[in-house]
């Protein structure tokens, strides 16, 4: 079977430019706190800038031991930040272990949706960070449209394939409380952010934002159906926009899956694990989020399940 890959909103592509202030308002409507938004050319630049801010707070930053993003590992080295690796339950933060290892006046960065596979206990993490005066940085790329936006700082990619699928860009949001704490350092952040060249894609981003809840819900529902039918699928009880399936010889399994389920842009529909960005366990991630949501009706999902079951 050949499936359409995730595409940007067609109306947004036809009306790509737009009003930045409108987009900032819609972003804040989707989140649980209000943020001052800085638009950037990529999600990675947003993560880097958030860690640059973290260094103002402390020389140490905590990251999850899996289910994050490669930049969480690389950028602290560039900024001379010490990495404090937090032990997780397959990417999901264990609150007791976080309580034991999180130092006062430090920083923590994680993704709202661990490895795109399962949600973090964001409310509880926020509470613990407030008690310890820890700067909480939340990467909302995989969960915007769902329950997210609890961090002191949020970062988001609007590249591909993401919930906000503009094939370009990203943004950083700083909460009003953190803006006040940063004081004069806020001017340095503004100067640094201006070194990043950005384009006007706010018409497209607006359409993606307006569809974010529907997009997130569709990927969660499709992934749930697949998880319920595949024997070795993990995180059945959790929301996720992709599916981890434990297996031996994941490279071979991945090759077989991609021979039966193809994307029309010829990209792989699987991620081979162990992989820090997903999960450090043998298996594959079936990347539901790479499929265009227009394809995800019950008939197509059933065909996917039949194809996966014939291999696994």
From Swiss-Prot:
Classification via Gene3D superfamilies: Type I PLP-dependent aspartate aminotransferase-like (Major domain) (3.40.640.10)
GO biological process per UniProt: polysaccharide biosynthetic process
SUPFAM superfamilies: PLP-dependent transferases
UniProt cross-references to InterPro entries, sorted A to Z: DegT/StrS_aminotransferase (IPR000653), PyrdxlP-dep_Trfase (IPR015424), PyrdxlP-dep_Trfase_major (IPR015421)
Molecular-function GO terms, alphabetical: pyridoxal phosphate binding; transaminase activity
Origin superkingdom: Archaea
Protein name listed in UniProt: Uncharacterized protein MJ1341
């Amino acid at each position: 079977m050949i499936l359409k890959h995730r595409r940007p909103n067609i109306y947004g592509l036809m009306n790509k430019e737009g009003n930045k202030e409108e987009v900032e308002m819609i972003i804040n409507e989707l989140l649980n706190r209000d943020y001052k938004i800085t638009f950037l050319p990529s999600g990675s630049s947003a993560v880097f800038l958030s860690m640059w801010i973290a260094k103002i707070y402390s020389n140490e930053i905590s990251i999850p031991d899996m289910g994050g993003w490669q930049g969480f590992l690389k950028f602290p080295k560039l900024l001379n930040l010490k990495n404090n690796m937090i032990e997780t339950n397959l990417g999901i933060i264990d609150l007791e272990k976080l309580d034991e290892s999180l130092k006062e006046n430090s920083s923590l960065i994680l993704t709202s949706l661990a490895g795109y596979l399962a949600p973090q206990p964001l409310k509880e993490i926020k509470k613990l960070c407030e008690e310890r005066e820890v700067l909480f940085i939340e990467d909302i790329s995989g969960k915007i449209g769902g329950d997210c936006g609890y961090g002191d700082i949020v970062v988001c990619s609007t590249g591909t394939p993401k919930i906000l699928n503009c094939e370009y860009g990203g943004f950083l949001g700083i909460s009003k409380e953190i803006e006040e704490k940063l004081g004069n350092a806020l001017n340095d952040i503004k100067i640094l952010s201006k070194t990043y060249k950005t384009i006007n894609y706010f018409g497209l981003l607006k359409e993606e934002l307006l569809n974010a809840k529907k997009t997130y819900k569709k990927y969660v529902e499709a992934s749930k159906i697949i998880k319920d039918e595949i024997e070795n699928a993990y995180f059945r009880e959790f929301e996720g926009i992709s599916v981890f399936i434990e297996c031996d010889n994941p490279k071979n399994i991945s090759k077989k899956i991609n021979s039966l389920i193809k994307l029309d842009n010829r990209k792989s529909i699987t991620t081979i694990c162990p992989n820090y960005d997903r999960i450090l366990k043998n298996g594959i991630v079936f990347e539901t989020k790479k499929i265009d949501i227009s394809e995800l009706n019950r008939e197509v999902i059933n065909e996917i399940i039949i194809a996966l079951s014939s291999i696994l």
